[in-house]
Amino acid sequence: VKVYVGGRSLAGAQVTVDGRPLDPRYDLKRLSPAGFEWTYEGNGPAQLALALLADHLGDDARALALYERFMREVVADLDNSWELNAAEIDAAIRKIGG
């Protein structure tokens, strides 16, 4: 089961999946020049939502269709330090109608 972890350090916002840096997936859509963010709605949180969904779902088209709702419902409400597992992401996707 994949585990996604986000936190802040002097180097900025860092997000990992199973201990490895999460790919921002700029190849799908470049929403944020500054990388990932969370705790609010905006470009950085949208990039994180897209990256989380693309990695979790393995379906780029579905990730592109869902990332804005996922950003508003999940990413904007994350704490400064957070952890999400696959079951939590699946539950959030069901909640937003994905």
Predicted segments — roles?
Residues V1-K2:
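Long, low-hydrophobicity ectodomains and other hydrophilic envelope-associated domains
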Residues G6, A11-L66:
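Amphipathic alpha-helical packing elements
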Residues G58-I96:
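Short, compact, well-ordered microdomains
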